[in-house]
Amino acid sequence: MQVLPPSSTGGPSRLFIMRPVATTLLMVAILLAGIIGYRALPVSALPEVDYPTIQVVTLYPGASPDVMTSAVTAPLERQFGQMSGLKQMSSQSSGGASVITLQFQLTLPLDVAEQEVQAAINAATNLLPSDLPNPPVYSKVNPADPPIMTLAVTSTAMPMTQVEDMVETRVAQKISQISGVGLVTLSGGQRPAVRVKLNAQAIAALGLTSETVRTAITGANVNSAKGSLDGPSRAVTLSANDQMQSAEEYRQLIIAYQNGAPIRLGDVATVEQGAENSWLGAWANKEQAIVMNVQRQPGANIISTADSIRQMLPQLTESLPKSVKVTVLSDRTTNIRASVDDTQFELMMAIALVVMIIYLFLRNIPATIIPGVAVPLSLIGTFAVMVFLDFSINNLTLMALTIATGFVVDDAIVVIENISRYIEKGEKPLAAALKGAGEIGFTIISLTFSLIAVLIPLLFMGDIVGRLFREFAITLAVAILISAVVSLTLTPMMCARMLSQESLRKQNRFSRASEKMFDRIIAAYGRGLAKVLNHPWLTLSVALSTLLLSVLLWVFIPKGFFPVQDNGIIQGTLQAPQSSSFANMAQRQRQVADVILQDPAVQSLTSFVGVDGTNPSLNSARLQINLKPLDERDDRVQKVIARLQTAVDKVPGVDLFLQPTQDLTIDTQVSRTQYQFTLQATSLDALSTWVPQLMEKLQQLPQLSDVSSDWQDKGLVAYVNVDRDSASRLGISMADVDNALYNAFGQRLISTIYTQANQYRVVLEHNTENTPGLAALDTIRLTSSDGGVVPLSSIAKIEPRFAPLSINHLDQFPVTTISFNVPDNYSLGDAVQAIMDTEKTLNLPVDITTQFQGSTLAFQSALGSTVWLIVAAVVAMYIVLGILYESFIHPITILSTLPTAGVGALLALMIAGSELDVIAIIGIILLIGIVKKNAIMMIDFALAAEREQGMSPREAIYQACLLRFRPILMTTLAALLGALPLMLSTGVGAELRRPLGIGMVGGLIVSQVLTLFTTPVIYLLFDRLALWTKSRFARHEEEA
């Protein structure tokens, strides 16, 4: 049995009621601390929950995917695989590029992970090819995380090579130095270089080979130490003209002598200033450009990082020529700010609605002012605690405060209503405040700690979802705690000073009409309650049916992971036939760009073609479509995507895959669509057998759309089958063959030009304009042991074959990723189940393993823990209530209200067409804390009436229900109106907020109607059970 403080003393509130000045100053201190905290808090879209992620890129121009895999990726993977704290390692080896993405455990600091990566790269250095142009480069960035800012650099007067050179040295480097920036990439590939295009016929006629030319260039351009002269009186540094800086100097280079006459490089090659890689290109809208993508470090604050870039840009662009134009095409922070602003507006709207409902019930301005002060004070004070906890102002913390509006006002309402009741009975305001606050103090404590108990399981959610909602749960808990403090200190003090019999009795036409309305409602409720109490078993059956119905709804409701947000940016992947060349792909890309830019919702477009570590193959292109602001377009992002895909379907020979960018990025690779499923095997042959079979099955499933795979094994290969015996007789080694082919077709970087500001490359290749395709192989010549020139065709046959365009690994084993979207009439849960069922029908061998990735894997994990999360919340609340009430039975009575909330929430979600996602589940957990307030207020007063007035249990619960009907209705409507702005949200980020509001409004409506009748019935049934149990024990003791 609980022990209440004497009602005459005021309990813990007495000190604050009797010392109004001290109480006022204490509240002013909380207010000032909150205001200062608000100004100091950073702003972000969501809490920072990124996995520590590092990307390692190695470029080896001319190398095939299998060479990149065996010579570069595999040695690095073996070293990385030994690092502690590594969660997942994925890699992609394509023509000339190896990209390894390392994702670490959430608990590992990024700086520690960086040190381990650097050590592993150092250990693998001796295992990598000796002719790598550059060592592996790592960046603290998640490649799947969309850039925080995209800039396009264009010029109508300067070549792109000069533009990129200036942008790289004057702009990109400076932006890279900004705190929070993880990587700045320049897409477009127009880095300056001297290109040497050999005329195969010319060097063959002179008896030379490409290797002769390469050796001559390499030896003629050096930059090394030469020493100095140190005499008796002065020192002299040695220097020489060992560097060649321009294409003209290289043209004059003598590569050999024949019959005493020099042969210059210009005689056998076209030497020109050009781009280091001619198979790269980027466009902004329809104009060729250098596209600068800025990505943040995992964990960096996106708003402050973007603000720093914006502040620096004017200074950086001033250093560029006037003909060079820098345009910000996308800035993710624009939508983040808009989303946060909309959420703040909804918070203010919730406060206004709650104050309005208070006035409607209390019909008294002084009585309305008191909770009108308590609510913002509790919310503002929360900001001070958020600063100390390193939180940010984001959508989730603002949602927590919006929901808290309905929570925090409850405490003030309960206190005011109880004090007002004593004043209306004729007691002085001070005595009424002491008596009312002392009487209600235990109820406030019960409400507060039982509600916080519901939030405790959220803090123990695992992985990234737990990190995501940690700020939400703690922010809400802090607001509730501050509210309890304010309600037990400031609220009764203000009641003692502001309320009086005259003010409470003073009525106008509105107050008289509303009073009569409430009296009629209470009278009707009393009549209905009396009838219900006469039919307890029928009422109990209704309560049990809600439990059964909630289970059924839980089973059948569509389930998802996280709402798809409209952030105004669409990422796209364009794919053409596997044999497509760079020129062919660039042409197709421009056709698609023309179609996309015609859409009225599209503001700008950037696209990129080529292989440079971000794009895996020549037959694919990356696109970023920037939409107009939400208030300037008619359709949401999903409708725009559907419209664009329909339009692009008319372009022959290409497939376009689109997905909206999201604030929450869990994946470690850029995917074609939203969700991923992987097949992993011990060999590529196993994948080549089973991937097509599974793809065929999945493409037939109605639960999936846009099904695609990164498995591309039909890339054209010209296999050079060398007769080793013939080659050996001529003194030609396989290294000679590889060198000759690399010199001709690999855009080989053979020398470096050093300047004061940068370094540039000399690129060697054959001029294949007159001998396109496989015919170019007939021009290859090698040097035999006797100095003669031997055609490649004399020792080798060319065989056409197929090979993968890229080779992907997951944790060092071959893997392919199947990407898919979910149609509008299905949920992610439906899609996951359909894939699992299809997998079972294939009877995959034991060496093939499957796994969902990214958000789909997180969905499975969250779904699996949801039931346990709700059970944990219920158990935690039972324990807290049991301790507070010193009873095993009363907590069960209180918890019997929960199924009604679940039924209401699930029905509302289904009617609204929303999925049961993580946000909606959080709403249901919060409902568990809200709806039990009704039962607590009823049971507290019923127990007090039984103990102090000697009422029977039936009379006590009946009177408690009538007495507490108005505050119950008031607090429920306050919580409902606090969630209503979220449910009706239409602005930026509304997709994230709406499921929480829908679930809470639906749950509150249904639970309010049902629990007013089921709770008193269950209270009486458990009272009978307790009496029966006691009598049984008593008989046993007598018999003993």
Swiss-Prot record:
Main subcellular location: membrane
Induction summary: The mdtABC operon is transcriptionally activated by BaeR.
A GO CC term attached to the entry: plasma membrane
Regions crossing the membrane: 16-36, 347-367, 369-389, 396-416, 440-460, 472-492, 537-557, 863-883, 888-908, 911-931, 968-988, 998-1018
Protein location: Cell inner membrane
Membrane topology: Multi-pass membrane protein
GO molecular function, one term: xenobiotic transmembrane transporter activity
Pfam families on file: ACR_tran (PF00873)
The entry's keywords: Cell inner membrane, Cell membrane, Membrane, Transmembrane, Transmembrane helix, Transport
InterPro entries hit by this protein: AcrB_DN_DC_subdom, Acrflvin-R, Multidrug-R_MdtB
Subunit structure and binding partners: Part of a tripartite efflux system composed of MdtA, MdtB and MdtC. MdtB forms a heteromultimer with MdtC.
HAMAP family: MdtB
The protein's role, per its UniProt record: The MdtABC tripartite complex confers resistance against novobiocin and deoxycholate.
Similarity annotation: Belongs to the resistance-nodulation-cell division (RND) (TC 2.A.6) family. MdtB subfamily.
Descriptive protein name: Multidrug resistance protein MdtB
Gene from which the chain derives: mdtB
